[in-house]
């Protein structure tokens, strides 16, 4: 268990960490939620990758129906958001949310990703 003061000290010293909560009963004999720190998942690309491409990929990660992955009865069917697919595919995938997308971000955002997050109000 890490108290809030220690978590703040760790995150301030090592900005690639973010505060997270492990829900009760995640592990055997763990009947209470536990606050701790973790390294969050980050999507990384080279700086020279096209801005519009990275903007589009970032948008597809968060917005359902933005892209088409499959056909149903011969017609294109809009796919769920990439984050929604991750939530179905992996237990930690449900923790990938737009609200926490920038938590623990210790490297500069690509201009395309920055544009998307600015549009969504995550960056002022």
State what each model feature region is.
Residues 57, 113-117:
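Residue-level signal for nonpolar/aromatic packing positions in well-ordered secondary structure
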Residues 1-44, 49:
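Pocket-lining segment of extracytoplasmic ligand-binding domains
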Residues 123-124:
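Short, solvent-exposed mixed-charge patches
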Residues 61-97:
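Periplasmic-binding protein-like
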Residues 110:
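ATP/nucleoside-binding phosphotransfer catalytic cores, i.e., glycine-rich phosphate-binding loops
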Residues 48-50, 62-63:
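Short Gly/Pro-enriched loop/turn and capping motifs at secondary-structure junctions
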Residues 52-60:
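Short amphipathic alpha-helical coupling segments at ligand-binding clamshell hinges
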Residues 42-48, 98-107:
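Second-shell loop/turn segments in exported
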């Amino acid at each position: 268990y890490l108290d809030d003061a220690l978590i703040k000290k760790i995150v301030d010293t090592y900005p690639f960490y973010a505060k997270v909560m492990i829900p009760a009963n995640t592990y055997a004999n763990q009947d209470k939620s536990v606050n701790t720190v973790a390294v969050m998942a980050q999507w990384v690309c080279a700086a020279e990758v096209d801005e519009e491409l990275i903007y589009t990929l970032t948008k597809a990660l968060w917005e359902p129906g933005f892209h088409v992955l499959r056909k149903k009865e011969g017609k294109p069917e809009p796919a769920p958001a990439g984050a929604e697919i991750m939530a179905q595919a992996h237990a930690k995938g449900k923790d990938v949310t737009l609200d926490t997308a920038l938590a623990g971000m210790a490297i500069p955002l690509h201009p395309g990703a920055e544009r998307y997050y600015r549009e969504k109000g995550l960056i002022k």
